[in-house]
């Protein structure tokens, strides 16, 4: 009888090139995405050793971290940022890699561009020098971030040295109630298992609540798997997956597509296959979630209160909570809905897709951004921007008093002009709330797009269900 295998096992086994006695593996990489921050030294290493990019057709380059989201005719003002983008373009040209320029409508955040272009396909291995590469796992691919030296290795050989991971399944049952989105589900998961809960694992997301998510929602969930410490996150492909991929520029066409779908339908976990760890969550019990502290595991319900260190017996945890409260400028026991906001950011590889902007627009429609709030709405790609404008979403945002920007990573991280000032507090749809993540001294609360829009309207963290 054939061994029962998980989805991860099937993809891993199909890509094994070699296994060493100590268990170290060499795996084949199907797709490689590169951006301006982690690729310069990798290309430089190739040049110094006289190597070529082994498979330029399997590599896609796009600048996203450093690009401005305001007037692009002025170029990039910060010299270091400008040099990184110029270097990526020069390297792509030199090594024959397709590069999506800033003036290309396809340009955007790397993890939004890949799926849009049909570069992301089920059953493939996908890497990028970026921690949120797990996003692509929503398509039933094995996708994970790698370091700069590994970027060079993949460019040169189209392979990667890896140790196999353990299997974890997170089953999300039930139907989410009003105001509860994919972002709330993944925040609740991280709040439950912690930022080290997934360490050493590849996580498969399963269950009714995951199946019911759109592809955009599944990407949001897989995107934040890394925040639970996991190597990657993935969802078995289904008819929603195939429909999303069909007709994309780089996806198979005609008979090749039908053949691909036949293979993709084999990409599921065999019934009875072994998982090293199992976690369950009932989505029907959730309300909208927020983070209160400086770690993605610092999650509470919007109806809840900020924790009180006095209630925590473990000294290390108590001190961590005290430090977070101090940095965040919060008092123990205060209501989540009493936390005032200065800036709202809707965008990023977590929530920068058309579905996210539709959800935000529903809240903004007929309302005004609070006078005390700056609201930045940043589409994840030029194609998302175009579609949002065709649907008139940009007009809703602008009429509400929000800023409709050009695509890029923007305020997700302090690598471009969009940054929090010291002491400013944001409601952000991004993925990390570390100290200084959005700017030195900035304070970040992670929320869904609808919750971010609600905060923009009221000037404080607000239960979107009340609007």
Swiss-Prot record:
Its EC number is 4.2.1.33. Keywords: 4Fe-4S, Amino-acid biosynthesis, Branched-chain amino acid biosynthesis, Iron, Iron-sulfur, Leucine biosynthesis, Lyase, Metal-binding. Residues 422-443 are annotated as: Disordered. GO terms for biological process: L-leucine biosynthetic process. GO terms for molecular function: 3-isopropylmalate dehydratase activity; 4 iron, 4 sulfur cluster binding; metal ion binding. Pfam families: Aconitase (PF00330). CDD domains: IPMI. Pathway: Amino-acid biosynthesis; L-leucine biosynthesis; L-leucine from 3-methyl-2-oxobutanoate: step 2/4. [4Fe-4S] cluster binds at residues 349, 409, 412. Binds 1 [4Fe-4S] cluster per subunit. Its cofactor is [4Fe-4S] cluster. InterPro entries: 3-IsopropMal_deHydase_lsu (IPR004430), Acnase/IPM_dHydase_lsu_aba_1/3 (IPR015931), Acoase/IPM_deHydtase_lsu_aba (IPR001030), Aconitase_4Fe-4S_BS (IPR018136), Aconitase_4Fe-4S_dom (IPR036008), IPM_dehydratase_rel_enz (IPR050067), IPMI_cat (IPR033941). It catalyses: (2R,3S)-3-isopropylmalate = (2S)-2-isopropylmalate. PROSITE patterns: ACONITASE_2. Belongs to the aconitase/IPM isomerase family. LeuC type 1 subfamily. Catalyzes the isomerization between 2-isopropylmalate and 3-isopropylmalate, via the formation of 2-isopropylmaleate. Heterodimer of LeuC and LeuD. This is 3-isopropylmalate dehydratase large subunit.
